[in-house]
Design a protein with these regions (language model features):
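Glycine-rich active-site loop/strand segments that organize a redox cofactor
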Residues: 37-85
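Feature captures the FAD/FMN-dependent oxidoreductase FAD-binding
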Residues: 70-141
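Short amphipathic alpha-helical segments
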Residues: 19-20, 44-45, 144-148
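N-terminal Rossmann-like FAD-binding beta1-loop-alpha1 element of flavoenzymes
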Residues: 3-32
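Glycine-rich dinucleotide-binding loop and its adjacent helix/turn
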Residues: 61-62, 66-70, 75, 79, ...
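Active-site acidic short loop of glycosyltransferases
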Residues: 2-3, 27, 128-130, 157
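Carboxylate/His-rich catalytic cores and anion/metal-binding grooves
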Residues: 32-41, 128, 133-136
């Protein structure tokens, strides 16, 4: 499958890229590939109690869909609702492909395009595109950074990483 543009990541940045591409280049084909089973990136992944933005939503949110809620520092569920509203309002659903993880991307100079290997539920698919736009996060979903704390081995409680929050806590 060939697209003019492949956007990687269906979080805030990928959704913004999709909106702007659709508005400014309506004749260009594009897909937003999301490696996980849901859109939202950080806001879908982290589920611990009290998760909220560390920046005000007037800054973090979209220029084309201003944040209109009373609380400018928003909780995670409110941000997810905002992202879903945006996708629906601007008809980006058909452009988003969930469970599509980029395994490799190679530039082919002879053909002047990107050749991608996409893992879709452990099945590799080939895709090509002219423009490859990376809008993914900066961390691993499966192997987060775990800092070492002095005397950590003597701590008698549970050490919990927020990325793997246990709902029973």
């Amino acid at each position: 499958m060939h697209k003019d543009v492949i956007i990687v990541g269906a979080g805030i940045s990928g959704i913004a890229a999709g909106y702007n591409l659709k508005k400014s280049c309506p004749n260009k084909s594009f897909s937003i590939l999301e490696g996980r089973e849901n859109i939202g990136g950080t806001w879908d992944l982290f589920k611990y109690p009290g998760i909220r933005s560390d920046s005000d939503m007037h800054t973090l949110g979209f220029r084309f869909k201003p944040w209109i809620h009373d609380k400018s520092i928003a909780d995670g569920p409110s941000i997810m609702e905002y992202l879903h509203e945006t996708i629906n309002e601007y008809k980006l659903n058909d452009n988003i492909l969930l469970n599509h993880k980029v395994d490799s991307a190679n530039w082919n100079s002879k053909k002047s395009l990107w050749e991608l290997k996409i893992n879709v539920n452990n099945d590799l698919k080939d895709m090509t595109c002219n423009f490859f736009f990376l809008c993914g996060g900066y961390y691993s979903y499966t192997k987060p950074h775990m800092p070492y704390f002095k005397n950590q081995e003597n701590f008698k409680g549970h050490i919990v990483h927020p990325q793997f929050w246990n709902e029973s806590l």
